[in-house]
């Protein structure tokens, strides 16, 4: 069990995302980069989950019977497609405003998703366990990475998976993901990312090891401005994803 007296919530981060919550489902709004990134991360998640659990990726609902947790779910950009693929989905976010937006959009889409305004630590303390934990674009916004990764890892069932997507702590990432995306191109509101809170792949791997999870895959994700699309890459200097499993 994690210790409830401690939390990884950064109040300023929650306030920041709550202010722009109404724009979660606007593909041309503040979350445009996530809308563009979504197809790449969705394809990766579906591919790896189907391979792990011996599911037919071409089936209409290949994730049927699997329990998913989307940590820091925001407006539900990942929860909804996972639910459409048959997964039982819990979406958790510390921002009650984000959760309200997510609930409204799910209802409009006739999707049954269990959205909760809660913290990762509270879920872990309650003994929640999942086949798949999605930890996507969240770890760079928490106040205590080690505690956060400990709590999230505790919720992965034996034989289960955890996906993490984040931004590397490199000068290249500072130039592209912060200066470029926030100040020059203004794709994201200024202050969305803070360089000192970015996380290196080896730091995540160390956190996995402490939690008895085994790293099984890692890859970079790069943006092609000519095609206006994101693609898998060997270059992990800026955006990257890692996948870990808990041995059965």
UniProtKB/Swiss-Prot annotation:
Pathway: Cofactor biosynthesis; ubiquinone biosynthesis
InterPro entries xrefs: SAM-dependent_MTases_sf (IPR029063), UbiG_MeTrfase (IPR010233)
Keyword Electron transport carried by entry: no
Residues that bind S-adenosyl-L-methionine: 41, 72, 93, 136
Example of a GO MF term: polyprenyldihydroxybenzoate methyltransferase activity
EC class name: transferase
Similarity field: Belongs to the methyltransferase superfamily. UbiG/COQ3 family.
Name of protein: Ubiquinone biosynthesis O-methyltransferase
Protein species of origin: Brucella melitensis biotype 2 (strain ATCC 23457)
Gene: ubiG
């Amino acid at each position: 069990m994690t210790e409830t007296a401690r939390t990884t919530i950064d109040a300023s981060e929650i306030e920041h995302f709550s202010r722009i919550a109404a724009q979660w489902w606007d593909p041309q709004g503040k979350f445009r980069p996530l809308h563009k990134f979504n197809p790449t991360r969705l394809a990766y998640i579906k591919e790896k989950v189907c391979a792990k659990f011996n599911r037919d990726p071409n089936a209409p609902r290949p994730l049927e019977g699997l329990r998913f947790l989307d940590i820091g779910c925001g407006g539900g950009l990942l929860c909804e497609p996972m639910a459409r693929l048959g997964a039982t989905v819990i979406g958790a976010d510390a921002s009650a405003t984000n959760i309200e937006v997510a609930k409204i959009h799910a209802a409009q889409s006739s999707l049954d998703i269990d959205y909760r305004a809660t913290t990762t630590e509270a879920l872990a303390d309650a003994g929640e366990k999942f086949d798949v934990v999605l930890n996507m674009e969240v770890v760079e916004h928490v106040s205590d990475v080690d505690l956060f990764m400990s709590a999230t890892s505790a919720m992965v069932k034996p034989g289960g998976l955890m996906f993490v997507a984040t931004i590397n702590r490199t000068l290249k990432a500072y130039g592209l993901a912060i200066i470029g995306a926030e100040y020059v191109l203004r794709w994201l509101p200024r202050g969305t990312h803070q360089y000192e809170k970015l996380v290196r792949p080896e730091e995540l791997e160390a956190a996995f090891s402490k939690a008895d999870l085994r790293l099984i895959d890692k890859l970079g994700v790069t943006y092609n401005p000519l095609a206006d699309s994101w693609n898998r890459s060997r270059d992990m200097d800026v955006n990257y994803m890692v996948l870990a499993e808990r041995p059965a």
